[in-house]
A protein has these predicted regions:
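A short, acidic/glycine-rich surface segment
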Residues: 26-28, 52-53, 126-132
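A conserved beta-strand-loop-helix scaffold within acyl/acetyltransferase catalytic domains
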Residues: 28-41, 45-46, 51-71
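Short amphipathic alpha-helix that is part of the acyltransferase structural core
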Residues: 1-28, 45, 142-144, 151-178
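Short hydrophobic/aromatic beta-strand or adjacent loop that forms the aromatic wall/cage
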Residues: 39-41, 139-146
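Small/polar loops that bind or transfer phosphate-bearing groups
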Residues: 5, 101-102
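Conserved active-site alpha-helix within GNAT-family acetyltransferase domains
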Residues: 94, 98, 104-133, 138
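Conserved acetyl-CoA-binding loop-helix of GNAT-fold acetyltransferases
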Residues: 71, 77-94, 102
Length: 178
């Protein structure tokens, strides 16, 4: 069953996320990061054990990110990841967010869920704030994907501006250092 994450879930969430980070599939998460963003996360619990988790990070009024989608290796292939992404889609709808994005290596998985590949440059600069912590930031090989939720009306707020031309992830590192 999927439920909102609680303080008690953080150690297991970190273990599942960081097992994928060790393989270079996502960023490591500290306890502090998970506690700070706990309200953004859901967990998949089965027979009292957390076997997966995911977060929805709001980027802008019209865009949220599927973040830290991780499923325990023992539970892979059983639809846990799909159910967690559906939770993200439902959460975006509930919040009135029209677009959901992911930076991923699992293109086919997300395509099956209605996501489409987009140019990274079409995403707002704020998306790249985590990239300064990534060892691959200068050679990012993740695929940017977006799913538009047509049933959610367009936001009346400003939409997030795309990354300006000429700005690249290495420039973000220089900007962060200032």
């Amino acid at each position: 069953m999927i439920r909102n994450a609680t303080i008690e879930d953080v150690p297991r969430m970190q273990a599942v996320i960081n097992s994928h980070a060790e393989l270079g599939k996502m960023l490591f998460k500290s306890y502090a990061e998970l506690y700070e963003h706990l309200r953004d996360f859901a967990v998949f619990e089965e027979t009292g054990e957390i076997i997966g988790c995911v977060g929805v990070a709001i980027i802008w009024a019209d865009l949220a990110e599927v973040r830290s989608l991780a499923v325990d290796e023992k539970a892979r292939g059983r639809g846990v990841g799909t159910k967690l992404v559906h939770w993200c889609i439902d959460e975006a709808r509930r919040l009135g967010i029209r677009k959901l994005m992911s930076l991923t290596y699992e293109q086919r998985f997300f395509e099956k869920l209605g996501f489409e590949v987009v140019a990274k440059e079409t995403l707002p600069l704020k998306v790249w704030s985590d990239c300064v912590k990534c060892p691959k930031n200068e050679n990012c090989d993740e695929i940017a994907m977006v799913r538009v939720l047509p049933e959610v009306p367009p936001s009346t707020h400003l939409t997030a501006p795309p990354t300006p031309r000429g700005i690249s992830i290495p420039v973000l590192m220089e900007m962060e250092a200032e």
